[in-house]
């Protein structure tokens, strides 16, 4: 197994660049679409506080429904990752949005498809005193991996990626940096299966857009 370097899905927020993990870390792409829909044309900033939870749910529902359109069986995307968050595409996805009414699921095209996701994952964020940071998400492809411990080293072996959500489907760490200086602003990662993307976006939207105190 060798590491593979991939370009992130990068979205702007003023002078800040928010980096999302690309497929096969599908939760990163879902999070990127949610972020794009909420921030396109300053939609979230301009929304009344009472509308914002509704906007969040509508954007998340559209992102998960859209996943059925681009997600291949091996976790890759049938569409180039950055094209998934192109302004024209995001505008089309939000064209049916109504600030006062829930959009019926039956009207979605494509329709949402149930995808089994294994919540077995862990995440961590590390920052050093010079201001460098990493945001990581990893999985052993199942609770306790394969359940096999090597006799000589005591290492618990990971399971083989496969059906039942075993793999990087629910992974999606986020990193926000200054677009010009690359100074670090925010790093976050979440586990928990299907809820990872929405949990993380709900935090990052409050701390990068609402500028809410993290202690809250």
Please give the residue ranges for each predicted region:
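Second-shell loop/turn segments in exported
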Residues: 17-23, 45-47, 113, 187-191, ...
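Structured, charged N-terminal subsegments at the starts of enzyme catalytic cores
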Residues: 1-56
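Generic recognition of stable, solvent-exposed alpha-helical segments in well-folded globular domains
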Residues: 26-33, 51-58, 88, 119, ...
């Amino acid at each position: 197994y060798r590491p593979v370097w991939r370009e992130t899905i990068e979205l702007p927020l003023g002078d800040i660049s928010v980096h999302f993990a690309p497929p096969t870390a599908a939760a990163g792409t879902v999070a990127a679409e949610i972020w794009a829909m909420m921030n396109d044309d300053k939609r979230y900033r301009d929304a009344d506080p009472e509308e914002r939870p509704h906007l969040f749910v509508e954007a998340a529902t559209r992102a998960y429904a859209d996943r059925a359109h681009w997600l291949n069986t091996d976790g890759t995307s049938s569409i180039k990752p950055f094209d998934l968050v192109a302004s024209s595409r995001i505008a089309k996805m939000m064209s049916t949005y109504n600030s006062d009414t829930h959009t019926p699921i039956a009207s979605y095209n494509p329709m949402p498809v149930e995808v089994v996701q294994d919540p077995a994952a862990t995440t961590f964020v590390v920052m050093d005193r010079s201001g460098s940071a990493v945001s990581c998400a990893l999985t052993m492809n199942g609770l306790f991996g394969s359940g096999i411990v090597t006799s000589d080293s005591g290492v618990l072996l990971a399971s083989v990626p496969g059906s039942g959500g075993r793999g990087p489907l629910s992974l999606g760490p986020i990193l926000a940096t200054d677009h010009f200086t690359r100074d670090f602003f925010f790093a976050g990662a979440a586990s928990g299966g299907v809820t990872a993307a929405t949990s993380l976006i709900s935090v990052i939207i409050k701390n990068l857009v609402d500028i809410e105190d993290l202690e809250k």
